[in-house]
C-alpha cells in the first residue's frame, strides 16, 4: 500500500501528471522548481520522496520521470466554475467529464471537479482556469482549502479558519483580504484534494 502524500508532494505529483498530459513528456527538474518557486535541489528532494513512496520512478537522464499506475484514472464531472477571487458564481450543473489520477480519490467519498476563475489562490499554485478536485464533505479543519457556498448563493475557493463567532475565508494571495462571515452564512461543499492543469 502506498504511503500518504504531504500537500506539497501531492501538488508536485499533480503538476507532473498535468505536464505529461499536455506536453507528451515529463517535466524537467527546472520546470518543477520554476513552477513551485523552489530550488532544483528542493525539487529533487520532493521527487525522491515521491519515488520512495511508490508514486513514480526516475532515471539518470533528463526528463526521465515515470508516474506509476498511470492507467488508473477516475472520470469526474465538472459541475461548474468557482471563484478564486471575489465570490462570483454559484455551482452549476455538470458541463464536462475529465479523467483524474486515482491517487487523488479517497474511497468512500464522492468527488467532483470545479474550474477555477481568479487569482486569489496563486500562492498555493492554484491558477485561473485550473480544475480543482473536491472531495464532498461538510466539515473542514483550519487551514484546509475548501469550496464553500455563501448565503447569497455564491461559491468560492479559499483557506478556511473556523472561530466560535465567525468563519474566515482566507485567500492565498498577499494582495487580497480575507472574507469574514457568520457560521450560519457558510456552507462547506467539500475539501480540495488535487489540482488539474491543462496546458495549451
Swiss-Prot record:
InterPro entries: LexA, LexA-like, LexA/Signal_pep-like_sf, LexA_DNA-bd_dom, LexA_repressor, Peptidase_S24_LexA, Peptidase_S24_S26A/B/C, WH-like_DNA-bd_sf. It catalyses: Hydrolysis of Ala-|-Gly bond in repressor LexA. Coiled coil: none annotated. The active site is at residues 120, 158. GO terms for biological process: DNA repair; DNA replication; negative regulation of DNA-templated transcription; proteolysis; SOS response. One of its GO terms (molecular function) is serine-type endopeptidase activity. The record marks 84-85 as: Cleavage. Keywords: Autocatalytic cleavage, DNA damage, DNA repair, DNA replication, DNA-binding, Hydrolase, Repressor, SOS response, Transcription, Transcription regulation. It is an enzyme of class 3 (hydrolase). Residues 29-48 bind DNA. It comes from the Bacteria. Its EC number is 3.4.21.88. Homodimer. Belongs to the peptidase S24 family. Represses a number of genes involved in the response to DNA damage (SOS response), including recA and lexA. In the presence of single-stranded DNA, RecA interacts with LexA causing an autocatalytic cleavage which disrupts the DNA-binding part of LexA, leading to derepression of the SOS regulon and eventually DNA repair. NCBIfam families: lexA. PANTHER family: LEXA REPRESSOR, LEXA REPRESSOR-RELATED. This is LexA repressor. It comes from Pseudothermotoga lettingae (strain ATCC BAA-301 / DSM 14385 / NBRC 107922 / TMO) (Thermotoga lettingae). The gene is lexA.
Amino acid at each position: 500500500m502506498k504511503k500518504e502524500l504531504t500537500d506539497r508532494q501531492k501538488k508536485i505529483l499533480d503538476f507532473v501528471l498535468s505536464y505529461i498530459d499536455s506536453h507528451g513528456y515529463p517535466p524537467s527538474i527546472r520546470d518543477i522548481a520554476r513552477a513551485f518557486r523552489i530550488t532544483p535541489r528542493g525539487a529533487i528532494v520532493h521527487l525522491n520522496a515521491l519515488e520512495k513512496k511508490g508514486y513514480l520512478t526516475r532515471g539518470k537522464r533528463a526528463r526521465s520521470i515515470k508516474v506509476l499506475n498511470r492507467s488508473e484514472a477516475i472520470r469526474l464531472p465538472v459541475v461548474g466554475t468557482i471563484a478564486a477571487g471575489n465570490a462570483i458564481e454559484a455551482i452549476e450543473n455538470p458541463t464536462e467529464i475529465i479523467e483524474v489520477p486515482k491517487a487523488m480519490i479517497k474511497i468512500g467519498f464522492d468527488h467532483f471537479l470545479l474550474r477555477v476563475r481568479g487569482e486569489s489562490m496563486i500562492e498555493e499554485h492554484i491558477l485561473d482556469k485550473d480544475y480543482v478536485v473536491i472531495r464532498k464533505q461538510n466539515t473542514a479543519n483550519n487551514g484546509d482549502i475548501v469550496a464553500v457556498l455563501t448565503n447569497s448563493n455564491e461559491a468560492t475557493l479559499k483557506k478556511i479558519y473556523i472561530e466560535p463567532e465567525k468563519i474566515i475565508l482566507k485567500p492565498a494571495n498577499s494582495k487580497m483580504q480575507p472574507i469574514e462571515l457568520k457560521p450560519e452564512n457558510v456552507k462547506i461543499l467539500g475539501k480540495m484534494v488535487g489540482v488539474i492543469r491543462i496546458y495549451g
